[in-house]
Amino acid sequence: MVDKLIHPWDLDLLVSGRQKDPHKLLGILASEDSSDHIVIFRPGAHTVAIELLGELHHAVAYRSGLFFLSVPKGIGHGDYRVYHQNGLLAHDPYAFPPLWGEIDSFLFHRGTHYRIYERMGAIPMEVQGISGVLFVLWAPHAQRVSVVGDFNFWHGLVNPLRKISDQGIWELFVPGLGEGIRYKWEIVTQSGNVIVKTDPYGKSFDPPPQGTARVADSESYSWSDHRWMERRSKQSEGPVTIYEVHLGSWQWQEGRPLSYSEMAHRLASYCKEMHYTHVELLPITEHPLNESWGYQVTGYYAPTSRYGTLQEFQYFVDYLHKENIGIILDWVPGHFPVDAFALASFDGEPLYEYTGHSQALHPHWNTFTFDYSRHEVTNFLLGSALFWLDKMHIDGLRVDAVASMLYRDYGREDGEWTPNIYGGKENLESIEFLKHLNSVIHKEFSGVLTFAEESTAFPGVTKDVDQGGLGFDYKWNLGWMHDTFHYFMKDPMYRKYHQKDLTFSLWYAFQESFILPLSHDEVVHGKGSLVNKLPGDTWTRFAQMRVLLSYQICLPGKKLLFMGGEFGQYGEWSPDRPLDWELLNHHYHKTLRNCVSALNALYIHQPYLWMQESSQECFHWVDFHDIENNVIAYYRFAGSNRSSALLCVHHFSASTFPSYVLRCEGVKHCELLLNTDDESFGGSGKGNRAPVVCQDQGVAWGLDIELPPLATVIYLVTFF
């Protein structure tokens, strides 16, 4: 009988919710008698029905919620099914062997399981012809882990997981479940407390703030972006002009944000009209708080359900790719929120965060910092990045707050941080993680770009890992952004005293590969919108917007502009309302957008503005000494080719010069390509005069141009 097969101590552990290996008590138990026994644990039930070889049987109540049915020898897990309390008829979860393998453990615990998203969390799968969901969790401090959901009435004793190893892997395959099932983890901590957590590896969640995960299938979508993906893998250099977007506040319809599928069509059409090559999405990983803009993440493997399902997000990506628009995702591996339902003290003890409070809690954001010394934690983060690239076809990751990851003292006072093993302030583990991240991405996903939002002078951010660098493709040039705004916020009368703010960034422009960002960070928290930062009346402010954005386009570095900046949004950005699109009914806003579209088109079609732009060869000063008139001029070359160039002239004062002479030697021909003061862009119409080559005894030494107020003029120049 069952008495001989189940030790009372094991049964007590099962009933009390502390049994780490429920499979040794449940499922098919072989005996020395003529029969084997199917054992089911159903706490609170009065009867359990079992379908055996097509016939209905009622199991015998044993004790403490345990039921058994004697069956002939040779019965396997495929020969019977169990009626669950919710009416589901499915195979027995406790009749299956372990599915998490030794190679999984080996790779995961050394931080190199690059497809961990296919093995951890809730994975729809088929085992020996039987469909179900494999639930796997890492919780090394837990006494018991159960999966709870609608399917078991959220009862933590019904579906306890089996502990696979001493390193804290728990597993259970539950037949009969599928996509859309709601679930959470119920965990018994070392101290005996029962806590309920959402799934760190969850791929879909109910709308915030519930945090309830849903089983989602990331494999079923039929992609049609093969041409894009093939072309991306072969592209080594090209123009990158990025439209930074917060999906929840770009456009609304009937008082709500657009869905992923609605957004796909409108955003792709808009980006094509405006000649953007990429969109960068503020984090769409699941997050509980709208006001965090997505930067406090609880679901690192899930697109937020605010705008639709996982498959609808895949459609969003697919459609933009078909329209030749790349997608960059803001990704936050530096810190996570303290919300009790998510990663914080996940199994009752610090797990994803540092153990020491001073190092764990980040003073800037009141969030936890990841413990990069744990291989399982870095594998979790690495898996998240690779998931978005593999299953979601994302084209780039912009890593947020890199400086906070690089330094142990970031945002902390003396005594609030501990030095590394060498006594320094660098966070050696996170530096190694970033190198590992970039190495794997560039090896596994050719053509994918990585961007670092890094605000310090840390050396080698965009240097190759094998040369001692971090391995990013590009670094945000926050110094350029700060200096540029410092200059442009000055009255044009006083800008001559601040010319160095324009020229300083060019002295270090080629030490890294840079992005020139005009980002969301500059239009929030009382900073005002871009156009309202600028002095003067309406015409003057919009003229300065045109010269600001053309200045960004012409300099070496990839380009990024936050939504609304392209048409002169007046109000400061808020994540809780859409942009003021009705402004496009007004002349200045409409013509500014025309100018931005023309600038982007010029940038894309002129290799002078993007070819080999991380090399000093692409740039040559013509004049940066005309401080009195607030004029700078320079050539942009297409690599080492010196037969032609773009001549970019920026005029930052309100004066007009009908005849302005630049020292440009050897010019054969000069053609005006773009003038931001053109009337079609809202300008005064000055500056369109054909340039005149100045000669002395047949030798070309300069150019005589008409220089409009607060404007950029761009010429195509050929040389003798």
From Swiss-Prot:
Question: What transmembrane ranges does the database entry give?
Answer: none
A single Gene Ontology CC term: cytosol
Q: Where is the active site?
A: D400 (nucleophile), E453 (proton donor)
Reaction(s) this enzyme catalyzes, per UniProt: Transfers a segment of a (1->4)-alpha-D-glucan chain to a primary hydroxy group in a similar glucan chain
InterPro entries named in the record? A-amylase/branching_C (IPR006048), Branching_enzy (IPR037439), GlgB (IPR006407), GlgB_N (IPR054169), GlgB_N_E_set_prok (IPR044143), Glyco_hydro_13_cat_dom (IPR006047), Glyco_hydro_13_N (IPR004193), Glyco_hydro_b (IPR013780)
Task: Family membership, please give it.
Answer: Belongs to the glycosyl hydrolase 13 family. GlgB subfamily.
Q: Summarize the subunit comment.
A: Monomer.
Protein name per the record? 1,4-alpha-glucan branching enzyme GlgB
